[in-house]
């Protein structure tokens, strides 16, 4: 059901690879940055509910969804996001970042070269990165190890969907989140956030 309302993928060339994104609607531009294990599909309900009032652009961060693998730091992701913004030729964007996407959104909000009209953070944190060689916090290391050990299987996807939704979440929403989580890739173990 939610899959039927998301727009097709578009791509820009960047860093020797491609960044995937979805775009629809007209009006002020809202740029959407998903969290870890997410993708542009994470924003399906917004495409449905806001697409008639806003131009929505949701990316697949590098190493997520259909974007190519490159870069392993928030700085790398922020530079990729700036390339996407530049390719869209927009000013006064509204930036929305969820979880890991909030780290990127925060960097963009503080960048004098990014023209923005608004800024929204959802379920964000200051970042729990560690110097190279130092262990990640256990909750992030456990998520990455789960991907590494069993790749992405149905049990991993079900676990992620259940942990990220409250009791009483409609079945079709959880099923969609399972589909999004199944798209997580092994390359996530390389990311330094």
What is each of the regions a protein language model found here?
Residues 191-193:
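Conserved small/polar residues in nucleotide/adenosyl-binding loops
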Residues 2-18:
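N-terminal cap/lid segment of alpha/beta-hydrolase-fold proteins
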Residues 45-48, 57-96:
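Active-site loop/oxyanion-hole signature of alpha/beta-hydrolase fold enzymes
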Residues 17-66:
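Conserved HGGG/HGGXW glycine-rich cap/lid loop of the alpha/beta-hydrolase fold
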């Amino acid at each position: 059901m939610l899959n039927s309302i998301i727009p097709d993928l578009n791509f820009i060339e960047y860093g020797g690879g491609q960044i995937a994104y979805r775009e629809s609607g007209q009006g002020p531009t809202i740029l959407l940055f998903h969290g870890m294990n997410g993708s542009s599909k994470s924003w399906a309900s917004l495409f449905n509910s806001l697409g008639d009032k806003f131009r929505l652009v949701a990316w697949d961060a590098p190493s997520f969804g259909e974007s190519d693998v490159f870069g392993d730091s928030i700085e790398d992701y922020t530079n990729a996001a700036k390339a996407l913004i530049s390719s869209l030729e927009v000013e006064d964007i509204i930036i929305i970042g969820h979880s890991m996407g909030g780290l990127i959104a925060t960097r963009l909000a503080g960048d004098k070269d990014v023209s923005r009209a608004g800024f929204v953070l959802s379920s964000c944190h200051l970042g729990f990165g560690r110097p190279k060689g130092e262990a990640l916090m256990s909750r992030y290391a456990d998520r990455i190890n789960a991907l590494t050990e069993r790749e992405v299987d149905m049990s991993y996807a079900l676990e992620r969907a259940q942990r990220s939704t409250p009791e009483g979440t409609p079945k079709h929403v959880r099923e969609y989140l399972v589909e999004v989580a199944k798209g997580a890739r092994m390359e996530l173990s390389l990311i330094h956030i």
